[in-house]
Amino acid sequence: MDPKKIARINELAKKKKTEGLTAEEKVEQAKLREEYIEGYRRSVRHHIEGIKIVDEDGNDVTPEKLRQVQREKGLHGRSLDDPNS
């Protein structure tokens, strides 16, 4: 997210505590917060999708739901053509 938008979120939060927000500022704040949260969710999702879990013996124990997402995206050598990957 653009640093200017984050600064604006913080500015609106500070103003809300000190003097309150106008109706337009409340709408702007809600929109900016939603944009920030969506970006955060995308980042976390991307990070989790890149994880491969192995046990002490080196066996892949990644949950099947995550494996399916990785197959669809071709991550960690997984392929839709090979259901065992």
From Swiss-Prot:
Q: Which UniProt keywords apply?
A: Cytoplasm
Instruction: Answer whether the UniProt record assigns the keyword tRNA processing to this protein.
Output: no
Where is it located? Answer: Cytoplasm
User: What GO cellular-component annotations does this UniProt entry give?
Assistant: cytoplasm
Biased-composition ranges, Basic and acidic residues, are 62-85
Region (Disordered): which ranges? 56-85
Name the source's superkingdom: Bacteria
Main location per the UniProt record? cytoplasm
Please give the family membership noted in the entry: Belongs to the UPF0291 family.
NCBIfam families associated with the record: PRK02539.1
Give the PANTHER family listed for this entry.
UPF0291 PROTEIN CBO2609/CLC_2481 (PTHR37300), UPF0291 PROTEIN YNZC (PTHR37300:SF1)
The protein's matches in HAMAP family, at most eight in alphabetical order, are given as: UPF0291 (MF_01103)
State the protein's name: UPF0291 protein SGO_0570
